[in-house]
Regions:
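Short loop/turn segments that connect beta-strands within beta-propeller blades
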Residues: 20-24, 73-77, 131-136, 178-182, ...
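Beta-propeller domains
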Residues: 7-32
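A detector of repeated loop/turn-to-beta-strand junctions in beta-rich toroidal repeat architectures
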Residues: 13, 66, 121-124, 171, ...
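A short loop-to-beta-strand structural motif that recurs across blades of beta-propeller domains
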Residues: 15-17, 68-70, 125-128, 173-175, ...
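Beta-propeller blade signature
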Residues: 119-133
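Short loop/turn segments immediately following the C-termini of beta-strands
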Residues: 11-12, 64, 105-107, 169, ...
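Loop/turn-rich, solvent-exposed surfaces of beta-rich toroidal or solenoidal domains
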Residues: 171-173, 191-228
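Beta-rich, blade/repeat-based domains predominating
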Residues: 1-6, 34-58, 85-108, 124-126, ...
């Protein structure tokens, strides 16, 4: 949400749309200028996992079908592709050092292959990290951080507590890792909580982790210390 109450929402037709407080919506980010198209079955696009940069000046959007990671300037209303992954990207989030972390849910190049990994567990989910270079661009080859997961989905980078939380959707669990933000490493993998089909997540102001569950049509509030 922008400071004036405007919502920025993923939209297959346009990439992103903005919705004002009256409910009026219009395209945002000028995705068409960089060749964005959604014309199934020939061309499938799947914008997903919309997140602000730490300084709130940009929006990062993953594409779960094409594998593109988009960075949109809020002030200029312009978008560029900062990385094109070989498989779909579920969620992309920038840390305070400028590096972008992202999840590959499965080795999909299409909608049908993505839903194959939702129909049955396939352990090819991965967390990657895309380092920021001194010239302000991103390294062209992402670093593999954690692999072997059953549909890696939404995550949250908790730099204050040096923790990284991740939804492993097809394992019905939320994982917790120790985070070394300087080294870009995740260690001490643990199950924080078991809930059905965990998806996107956000740490609430009360210190509880809010996790969406599409299967149960609920939002779970999880104590990050106890997992309850």
């Amino acid at each position: 949400m922008l400071s004036d109450g405007t919502l920025i929402v993923a939209d297959q037709r346009y990439g992103l749309i903005k919705v004002d407080k009256t409910g009026a919506a219009e395209p945002f980010g000028n995705f068409q200028s960089i060749g964005y198209k959604h014309n199934p079955p020939e061309i499938e696009s799947g914008p997903n996992g919309v997140h602000f940069s730490p300084d709130k000046t940009h929006i990062f959007t993953a594409d779960v079908f094409s594998g593109h990671i988009y960075m949109t300037s809020i002030e200029d209303n312009k978008t560029k592709i900062i990385h094109s992954h070989r498989y779909g990207v579920n969620t992309a989030i920038q840390d305070s050092l400028g590096n972008v972390w992202f999840t590959q849910s499965t080795e999909n190049n299409s909608e049908s292959r993505l839903f194959e990994a939702i129909g049955k567990p396939i352990s090819d989910g991965i967390v990657y990290r895309l380092p920021l270079l001194e010239n302000g661009t991103f390294f062209d080859k992402p670093e593999l951080v954690v692999d072997g997961m059953d549909f890696a989905n939404g995550f949250y980078i908790d730099e204050k507590n040096n923790k990284f939380y991740l939804s492993e959707t097809m394992a019905n669990r939320v994982l917790s890792f120790d985070l070394d933000i300087e080294k870009g490493e995740l260690t001490n993998r643990n199950v924080l909580a078991k809930i059905p089909s965990p998806d996107n997540m956000q740490l609430n102001h009360d210190g509880f982790l809010w996790v969406a569950s599409p299967l149960s049509n609920q939002i779970y509030s999880i104590n990050i210390l106890s997992g309850e």
